[in-house]
């Protein structure tokens, strides 16, 4: 499957630049773009990535891995790849900070599927750093509160049947959009939370 480049409307007028691939041999280049061109150029307090996983139909395996920095999203379809990408494993185990929502399940899936763990302190659980009235605030609740009200309809606008198609190559357009937005929301939520916390620390 050839690598595909495109744009996804996140919300309002916010556009995401999206790379979608299942080619393991091309991943080192795209990961280098994330780490060196964008990540290393940012201020220290902005050095983190949004991370999200989509699961196989039986919920046991990782089907898709999404990484986001600012408006740049990389979608790697692990399920339809050759499942050999040591550069990605090294990237996940490096000292980069990742922000995600479903941290418990994602950690278990990475341990079971990849045999790796993101280092302690490098995986931020957004559900522990930001809570509404819910015991475990969902990504949708957080996105509505901090990013845009449009995210309140995300689950209802994405048919349940599509959740069983993350292993399909080529992914449907609606799945690509959903995956890109999930990764972006993970990034943008943590960015906004950090901005608020930074401002509060400097209020006198």
What are these regions (language model features)?
Residues 48-60:
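Short acidic, Gly/Ser-rich segments with clustered Asp/Glu that frequently serve as metal-coordination loops
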Residues 113-123:
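A short alpha->loop->secondary-structure connector
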Residues 124-148:
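Short alpha-helix plus adjacent loop in nuclease-associated cores
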Residues 1-49, 81, 126, 195-204:
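N-terminal accessory regions of nucleic-acid-interacting proteins
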Residues 72-92, 96:
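Nucleic-acid-processing active sites and adjacent nucleic-acid-binding tracks
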Residues 58-73:
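A short alpha/beta connector and helix-capping loop motif
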Residues 144-204:
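Acidic, Mg2+-coordinating catalytic module of metal-dependent nucleases/exonucleases
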Residues 96-103:
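Acidic beta-strand-to-loop metal/phosphate-binding motif
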């Amino acid at each position: 499957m050839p690598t595909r480049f495109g744009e996804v409307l996140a919300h309002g007028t916010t556009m995401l630049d999206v790379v979608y691939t299942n080619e393991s041999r091309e991943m080192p280049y795209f990961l280098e773009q994330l780490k060196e061109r964008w990540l290393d150029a940012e201020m220290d307090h902005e050095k983190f990535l949004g991370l999200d996983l989509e699961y196989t139909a039986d919920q046991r395996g990782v089907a898709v891995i999404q990484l986001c920095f600012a408006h740049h999203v990389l979608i790697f379809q692990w399920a339809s790849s050759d499942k050999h990408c040591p550069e990605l494993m090294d990237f996940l185990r490096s000292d980069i900070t990742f922000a995600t929502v479903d941290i418990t399940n994602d950690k278990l899936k990475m341990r079971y599927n990849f045999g790796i763990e993101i280092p302690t302190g490098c995986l931020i659980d957004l559900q522990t750093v930001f809570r509404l009235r819910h015991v475990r605030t969902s990504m949708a609740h957080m996105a509505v509160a901090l990013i845009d009200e449009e995210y309140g309809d995300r689950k209802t606008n994405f048919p349940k049947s599509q959740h069983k198609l993350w292993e399909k190559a080529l992914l449907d357009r609606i799945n690509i959009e959903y995956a890109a937005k999930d990764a972006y929301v993970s990034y943008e939520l943590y960015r906004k939370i950090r901005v608020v916390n930074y401002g509060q620390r400097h209020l006198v």
